[in-house]
Amino acid sequence: MLDEFLKRPHQEIREVGGQFGDEFIPLADLTHLPTRCKFMGFMPQWDFLDFFAEQGKKYPQFHLLMEAEVTDLIVAGNTVAGVQANTPSGEIEVRATLTVGCDGRSSTVRERAGLQVESFGAPIDVLWFRISRQPSDPGQVLGRFNPGKILVMLNRDEYWQCAFVIRKGAFEQIKQRGIEVFRHDILSIAPFLKERAQEITDWEQIKLLTVLVDHLRKWYRPGLLCIGDAAHAMSPVGGVGINLAIQDAVATANILAHPLSENYVSLNHLQKVQWRREFPTKVTQWGQVQVQERILSAVLGSQGQVKPPWFLRLFKKFPVLRRIPARLIGIGVRPEHVKTHSIS
């Protein structure tokens, strides 16, 4: 499956660093990961999801409903028995022994289930936009840090996927300053973009990501389990949200495959999934909160010259240290491995 997956459009990044004013700090070296692919892959979400939809068609039990939006849960007594959903042809009901909510940070499933959320807040939001890329552009630098400004640029081959980090709730104020001032802010931190900043002509081209860091106190109730961002909204720091979501899914399959084959899933089974995945979730979120508070907030509040924190300079002096964040980004706190057999 991996070979087929890598045929899809993607970019491979083997080293990650940050530009703090005039100083470049290498932060992560993924070439030493104990994995077959010693890189971090970036793939457009459509290609990523389409690949797995195609793989699912190999299994006769797999059925994918496109353009189906969950609107409510079907509840029998205290047990979730399925979902109601809107489709182009009308409302439908889908009933199941177990409903798995994996519908993201604004999860309808977890909201309808009444599951309690513990939120840690976040001092930042992110503005996403695209700017065309030229072969003469500098290589991949994950983050650029200037006084009061942070720009993350992801190489998408033909264009840069840009994330401009702002203070929480500051988007309206930025819009009031005007699009020309925003373009100037971009050029002040990435001057090589020059005329291409003019590609940003309208606020409609810029999408606001409201950053959340939270997790459910309990990921489940009878007949229902939440995983991924539905169970724990991750900060974009490190870009590891998708990794944890996939690891949640693998752990869920490993733990629940046998009970599901017998058509009986108890609360104890669902609790085992949370026990397995709660620790890596909390550790990762703690790390993200530290980066947000100690680095990102400090840069956004700075007015003088930006200098990297002293501990980041250690990564420049001792290259072996770069393997630590590489492992956290590329593998995670508790990696999961598929232990279930393929179902024909």
Segment roles from a protein language model:
Residues 59-60, 77, 190, 318:
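Acidic-histidine catalytic/liganding microenvironments
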Residues 68-71, 78-93, 98-207, 211, ...:
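Conserved FAD-binding catalytic core of PHBH/FMO-like flavoproteins
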Residues 150, 211-216, 231-243, 279, ...:
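Glycine-rich phosphate/pyrophosphate-binding beta-alpha loops
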Residues 1-57, 77:
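Active-site-adjacent segment of FAD-dependent monooxygenases/related oxidoreductases
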Residues 56-71:
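A conserved beta-strand/loop element that lines the FAD pocket in flavoprotein oxidoreductases
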Residues 254-344:
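C-terminal helical "tail/cap" subdomain of flavin- and related membrane-associated enzymes
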Residues 209-226, 282-283, 300:
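FAD-binding beta-loop-beta segment adjacent to the flavin cofactor pocket
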Residues 102, 228-229, 247:
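Active-site flanking residues adjacent to catalytic metal/cofactor-binding acidic residues
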